[in-house]
């Protein structure tokens, strides 16, 4: 997955909203968590270099940070019928470990 920092995206960023029958998450590179000074809850997950921010409070932090940088966000949707594999990933218990 070729992802760039928003500052290199000329003011636009496309993100994927992963949803299943019960919840949803916005996928971002884990480097964005530190770069945007996000503080995800234990309702968010990570797998390799991707963080899956839960769609309620954690994703709102992301959108607010990007808005403050004047970065336009486009969302692509990925719906899974049943449980998403994201639920099997590690939960964020401490941002320092990302």
Where are these regions (language model features)?
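Generic preference for well-ordered secondary structure
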Residues: 10, 46-47, 73
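Short, compact, well-ordered microdomains
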Residues: 52-98
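N-terminal, charge-rich interaction modules
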Residues: 1-12
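Cysteine-centric segments in proteins
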Residues: 14-16
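A short, structured beta-strand/loop element
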Residues: 20-47
């Amino acid at each position: 997955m070729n992802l760039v920092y928003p500052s290199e995206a000329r003011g636009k960023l496309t993100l994927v909203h992963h949803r299943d029958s019960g919840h949803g998450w916005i996928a971002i590179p884990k480097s964005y968590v530190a770069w945007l000074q996000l503080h995800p809850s234990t309702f968010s997950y990570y797998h390799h270099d991707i963080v899956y921010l839960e769609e309620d409070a954690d994703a709102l932090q992301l959108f607010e940070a990007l808005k403050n940088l004047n970065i336009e966000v486009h969302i692509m949707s990925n719906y899974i019928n049943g449980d998403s594999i994201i639920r099997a990933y590690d939960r964020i218990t401490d941002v320092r470990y990302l």
